[in-house]
Amino acid sequence: MALAGPLFAPATLAADVVDIGFVDQAALSNVRSFTDANRQLAGYKADLDRQFAARMRSVHDQSTQQRIAQEFQNKLAARQRELFGPLFARAQVAIASVASSKNLSVIVDKRIVIVGGQDVTSNVIALLSGPGDPIPPLNTPPPSSVGFVDQAQIDQVPKLKSANDDFQKFQASQQQAAQVKIKGAKTDADRQAVLKDYQAALADKNKQEIAPLVDKTRDAIADVAKKKRLLLVIDRSNLIYGGTDITSDVTNALK
């Protein structure tokens, strides 16, 4: 159940929030340590691809093919963690250090910033490009007026999960029926009509069952935010450092 953009933000946000920084994560990926790791991973994947192709030449049953594919996927994932795990940890320390030095309680992803905030990308890159490891701050993040929720956890609330599951089943059945109709369609106009009906059926189902729950979720987030005097609530995926976790408060309100 997707909730795009800030999940709660009053009109006075730009004037009230002064301790938010943001980082361009795409720029961080161009730091030499990350580009070197990407190059190493690409080389490792190329070797794995050759090994995988050689193994699969003599395998014909599907279960063995799936087992081998999973084996190689696990190898690639393990190498990725080995290469990038320490780099992500180092970047997190650098971000925390910059936030502390600039008295910022929250660092978010640049993608969600429309106006305001302090760009600390260059400061973080400078620390990551230095000869030594960034020094972690002595203090934990201060209390923040920015909250966050973990959408994945909210989606597991029983009535939300049930609605999502029902919608997925409905979508699958409608898609199957539409495919049958398209195969029997004689003209492009007939096929377009089938597609239009399929899209309309999904839109109606979404309006009836999903949209009301999205509204209830937004209302619950807004209520919790007001009680905790938060000026902004974002999804966990857009948060890089700091913030106030209100996920459990929201899930409790929705149960």
Language model feature labels by segment:
Residues 9-10:
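N-terminal signal peptide c-region/cleavage motif recognized by signal peptidases
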Residues 1-6:
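Bacterial N-terminal signal peptides
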